Amino acid sequence: MKAVKSERERGSRRRHRDGDVVLPAGVVVKQERLSPEVAPPAHRRPDHSGGSPSPPTSEPARSGHRGNRARGVSRSPPKKKNKASGRRSKSPRSKRNRSPHHSTVKVKQEREDHPRRGREDRQHREPSEQEHRRARNSDRDRHRGHSHQRRTSNERPGSGQGQGRDRDTQNLQAQEEEREFYNARRREHRQRNDVGGGGSESQELVPRPGGNNKEKEVPAKEKPSFELSGALLEDTNTFRGVVIKYSEPPEARIPKKRWRLYPFKNDEVLPVMYIHRQSAYLLGRHRRIADIPIDHPSCSKQHAVFQYRLVEYTRADGTVGRRVKPYIIDLGSGNGTFLNNKRIEPQRYYELKEKDVLKFGFSSREYVLLHESSDTSEIDRKDDEDEEEEEEVSDS
């Protein structure tokens, strides 16, 4: 047995020297199953020590013995090498790596394909971009050619300038005609306003010169009216929910004299009315807003106003002074207001003086205006006579 082992060792040494490496049979079978493809030729790695080291004597003997058995029937898997040993296996990297070699080649091919694809895309894109640029350049050239032709046509003396001048003259003539037409319209409107015929005439249709009159008839616009509508006055001049027709003037004042109204019905004396506490008194049939109610049916709801006003007057020496005087104004009543048995005009102030008599509508009552310093002897006499008549009637 020892002789057989020594012969095998010698054979293995010779094969190592010749460059043929004999691997265990089990390892070769395993590699054939995993990698059916042809592996690249194994490159022999040079030994750092200079010579090819021979495996230990015990291992090749065992491997050779097992190899003889594997040649016959044995298919048992080979023993795994101890990872703790610092020695590396002398098999090339291609045999050590169990993963298929073509996977790495595919990865390299994919990496190499990317720049090729980019170049192809650029080649596909470049012709479209070049065509677009060519189209732009052609458009610019056309535009430049048109502009150059226009400039040359304008610079040329002849038909182009003549047509432009004719158009300008036609436009100027049309503008002048329109101006004349509108000036004539304005003159007509001014004449109508001066005569006083505005309103309905201002809405007449005025035909424009030239062309069909039916298509170009323009209605004249209505002029705005700046008159007072009275809406603001109604909003500000309401009392107890009723709109008052009258508004006091800026010169309204409260008098210093104590004026009074003495009403009489036929010869009967009625209670005295003191009218010096306000600047104005409204007389009418509407008791809700009237300061001095008048119950006669011939009187209006807002019949008249008794107003105090501050007015100027000239003294005896020629100087100008101011004084508060009483006035009466009719508010457009139906049956009118009478001052000393004379009807006064509506919406107009009339100055009142001492002992003036006022009557409203068809009422039989008379109102005599007096103040505190006026002579009331006649009224006192009438009162005494009335008292005597009452006593006589009572005695009889």
Swiss-Prot record:
Residues 281-344 form the FHA domain. Residues 383-396 have a biased composition (Acidic residues). It comes from the Eukaryota. Ubiquitous, with highest expression in heart and skeletal muscle. Residues 1-10, 107-142, 213-225, 373-382 have a biased composition (Basic and acidic residues). There is a cross-link at K30 (Glycyl lysine isopeptide (Lys-Gly) (interchain with G-Cter in SUMO)). GO terms for cellular component: cytosol; nucleoplasm; nucleus; spliceosomal complex; U2 snRNP; U2-type precatalytic spliceosome. Residues 77-105 have a biased composition (Basic residues). GO terms for molecular function: mRNA binding; RNA binding; transcription regulator inhibitor activity. The modification Phosphoserine is found at S35, S49, S52, S54, S58, S99, S153, S202, S394. Degraded by the proteasome upon binding to the SMAD1/OAZ1/PSMB4 complex. SUPFAM superfamilies: SMAD/FHA domain. Required for pre-mRNA splicing as component of the spliceosome. As a component of the minor spliceosome, involved in the splicing of U12-type introns in pre-mRNAs. Down-regulates NF-kappa-B signaling by competing with RELA for CREBBP/EP300 binding. Involved in the microRNA (miRNA) biogenesis. May be involved in cyclin-D1/CCND1 mRNA stability through the SNARP complex which associates with both the 3'end of the CCND1 gene and its mRNA. It is linked to Neurodevelopmental disorder with hypotonia, craniofacial abnormalities, and seizures: An autosomal recessive disease characterized by severe psychomotor retardation, intractable seizures, dysmorphic features, and a lumpy skull surface. Patients are hypotonic and have poor feeding in the neonatal period. This is Smad nuclear-interacting protein 1. It comes from Homo sapiens. The lineage of its organism: Eukaryota, Metazoa, Chordata, Craniata, Vertebrata.
